Amino acid sequence: MSDAAYFTEMEAKIPTGKVRTRFAPSPTGYMHIGNLRTALYTWLIARSHGGTFILRIEDTDQGRLVEGATDVIYRTMAECHLNHDEGPDIGGPVAPYIQSQRRDTYGKYARLLAEKGGAYYCFCEKCASEEDTGDFDRADDPCRDLLLEDALRRVEAGEPYVIRQRIPKEGTTTFHDAVFGDITVENSTLDDQVLLKRDGLPTYNFANVIDDHLMGITHVVRGSEYLSSAPKYDLLYHAFGWEVPTYVHCSPVMRDAQNKMSKRHGDPSYEDLKAEGYLTDAILNYVALLGWSPKGELAEQEIFSLDALVKAFDLTGISKSPAIFDKAKLDHFNAVYLRAMSPEDFAKAAEPYIRQSVKGDFDVAAIAALLQARCERLTDIPEKVDFFDACPEYDVEFFTNKKSKTNPEVCKAMLEAAIPMLAALPRWTDEAIHDGLIALAEQLGVKNATLMWPVRIAAAGKLVTPGGAVEICRILGRGETLRRLRAGLEKLA
């Protein structure tokens, strides 16, 4: 097939008529929060417009690839319910969706651009690293002014080369971004970036333009760090005579006011957050609000399901200002989602964490019921329930509590009265234990808390517990409860 026929065929394949977005990660490690936000916004744009969401793997930088990272991408997208309509695993009308499998395409389009005058062959030794280092001075490059036929003769002779973008020496380039508006730059400030490296692989900046065009991408979402490259992308589109997609540049997610989030500095990836006990839905909800806010009647709303986000999402809500990742705020979101779960679903999610500390034959569902309103992260659970298996050593001062009007002497009297009452209960249920303790407090002429405090301390050995004396005693069982209360009484003797 001739190159002309090839280009005609490629253009004919381009889908048209609806919004098409793409998430195009590089398989270089875990899904960091900025990447997850890009995936989410890209997915939301497609879904809110009834469009198509594409997953593309950008693996042209072979030196940075990490084994297994592509599987992490698939797994994360599936867990987050960001289902794609086209991609490497399911195919589609503009396959392949892995850049390393499109190598010939980039070479053909780079050569086409050189024929159009928008690029040139560069044979300089300074290109030997195969990558433009950023200090390239096009004014000093004799290759820029080579006649195309002379350059092609050198290529035919086997001379190593790169293909560089031919940036106009004068004038300005203006591009439009959906977030930042119109931006104009002086062409003299732009470098003749490498498009095709000596090994025949494209640079990121070239491959993404070619792929976005050939895949019919209408909206390109990326970080604001790429704003400086956008005028060069714009010039590439115009040099080919192609329509420019809508750019959506998102400001960075920051660790604090001065520093961007970075895996190198220990900032969490999506998988890290999952391992720390955060729910996927809570993570997505929080990440959606890192740089975007709803408008109108939803302006004060914080909690959004994915379906609700699809209905609410609008590009006008994306902020130019950086967003600061606040773990305390994420804790709040996670707590809301934990409390909204059905008791059955929460118990299922909590059980592995409960079992990290509780090995005995206890009612896991009952323990989970105590926890649901009292934890912000699933990983909080083991420490909260470790007393069920074995009562920890505790200080006798735990029995002193000003609000409950207790001290060691008072608690000794309370336990001396509570032990025989609990031993004599005909049934060991929450209701029976509760009613028995309340009646005993009335009989002793003390506040309920004055009796409940020492019973809970002796039963759990901790100042702070999920649930109170009644629930803890019921789950421990009569025999273990009485054993622990007697041990507490011995401490007070």
Located regions from the model:
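N-terminal Rossmann-like or analogous alpha/beta NTP/dinucleotide-binding catalytic cores
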Residues: S2-G134, S229-W242, A282
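Active-site cores that bind ATP or allylic diphosphates and position pyrophosphate for catalysis
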Residues: A119-H249, R255-M261, S269, P426
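Charged substrate- and nucleic-acid-binding regions of tRNA-handling and nucleotidyl-transfer enzymes
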Residues: E431-L492
